[in-house]
């Protein structure tokens, strides 16, 4: 009886954990968005997200405008990681 209870509790806990992981993944990346990375000259500045959005628009036009970005400085360049419409 003890082992059956332990098995049941383990299955319930595993179910909650797996369900939570799927919810977190859904929040992290919208389904209609694709990730893009690119390196640009200069630094991120005080608002790196806005810098990256402007860099992508300059490179690819308004159609390439990302919805959100992260910016990392690398010497005289910066790396932009953004989500754009697929």
Curated annotation (Swiss-Prot):
One Gene Ontology cellular component annotation held by this UniProt entry: extracellular region
Location of this chain's protein in the cell: Secreted
Signal sequence segment: 1-26
InterPro entries on file: SCRL
Keywords from the named record: Antimicrobial, Disulfide bond, Fungicide, Plant defense, Secreted, Signal
Protein known as: Putative defensin-like protein 234
Taxon lineage: Eukaryota, Viridiplantae, Streptophyta, Embryophyta, Tracheophyta
GO biological process, one term: killing of cells of another organism
């Amino acid at each position: 009886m003890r082992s059956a209870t332990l098995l049941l509790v383990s299955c319930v806990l595993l179910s909650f954990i797996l369900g939570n992981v799927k919810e977190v993944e859904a929040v992290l990346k919208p389904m209609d968005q694709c990730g893009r990375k690119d390196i640009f000259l200069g630094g991120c500045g005080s608002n790196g997200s806005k810098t990256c959005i402007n860099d992508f628009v300059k490179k690819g036009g308004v159609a390439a405008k990302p919805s959100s970005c992260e910016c990392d400085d690398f010497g005289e360049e910066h790396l932009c990681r953004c989500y754009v419409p697929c």
